[in-house]
Amino acid sequence: MKLIKSIMSAFAIVLATTACAGNGGENKKSNEPTKEDNKMEVVSLNKAEFLKKVYDFEANPNDWKFEGKRPAIVDFYATWCGPCKALHPVLEELSKEYSGKVDIYQIDVDQEKELAAAFGIRSIPTLLLIPMKEEPRITQGALPKDQLKKAIDEFL
């Protein structure tokens, strides 16, 4: 019994030492910004930010008045939603590909229930596609990247 305890103790010490040792300074990441760091990412919005950056539905409840500087996509999602999780990396890729041309936002429907209710969100993921001068369109489901690119190129 003492032998087993000794072996387990030795194993625990080796494991702890190895885990704490780190990578010995290899593969250190530079603090200098790279081109990749300068690209856009999907931006999470709360209600106040949505009212400023997208649409102030409190001031203009009957008329759509887009507040953005470029076309946008708003992803209504939930952290527990499988299709939402599958869509997120696609939106991240698109935010980098269309950096400076299209803004991509996300809204957690569990945290921002008032926003979800204002747009009648009943199914997630739901995407709000917002061109500069036309009325927005809503699409539901985790669309593949090629369909989203087509929607961006044709509608936005």
Residues of each region from the PLM?
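Non-catalytic, surface beta->alpha helical segment in thiol-disulfide oxidoreductase systems
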Residues: 123, 128-156
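C-type cytochrome heme c attachment motif
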Residues: 79-86, 126
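Structural microenvironment flanking redox-active thiols in thiol-disulfide oxidoreductases
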Residues: 94-97, 102-121, 149
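Hydrophobic beta-strand anchors of alpha/beta hydrolase catalytic cores
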Residues: 73-74, 104, 127
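N-terminal targeting signals for export/organelle localization
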Residues: 1-51
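Typically the conserved alpha-helix immediately C-terminal to a functionally engaged Cys/Sec
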Residues: 85-97
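A short beta-strand-turn-helix
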Residues: 45-71
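Short pre-active-site segment immediately N-terminal to redox-active cysteine/selenocysteine motifs
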Residues: 69-72, 76-80, 123
